[in-house]
Amino acid sequence: GLSGMKFTDEEIEELAERIRAMKKTGTHLCCSIGFLTEKQARMLYDACLDRINHNLNSSRAYYSHICSTHTFDQRVENIHMLQKIGFEICSGGIIGMGESKEDVVDMLMELREIQPEALPINFLLPIKGTPLGDKDISGLTTEYCMKVLCLARLMVPQSDIRCAAGREVYFKGEEKKLLSVVDSIFASGYL
């Protein structure tokens, strides 16, 4: 797989060949690939890739606290370029990185403007040894997580709302409750 800021055209062409092969099965395909040039995005579009995941991750105001390699505006510009080419967009965020409730609302307002076809909400799973490994997640209760998902449903009703990372921790076997709010859940890494 590919992830990051810069890829060679050769790497993208290799991925495009794989996409063309998978499309022969009639599968709807989504890639989470990072930043692309317009030329590279067109290569994937011409290979019949349907959707690209490019999460906002956080609000504009909080973004510099979680990322130093690029700006929030660069993410938004990348998404708009992908939409202009014709891709469906999957874009959401991560809850629990230290953002305020206002940041959650602001992120959802940005997503409402983008109008992604799918909006995944991830709940932070701190991993020791990473920059967010010691993050206090005591505020990520089942009730709070459900409120965030409900807010996403109300604020971005045209998008398929998806509960992604953290579902198995924060909903602890209560996933049936999720289905009253979300369109799909991720289980064992799969939608």
Locate predicted features.
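Conserved Radical SAM active-site core
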Residues: G1-G92, M97, K101-I114
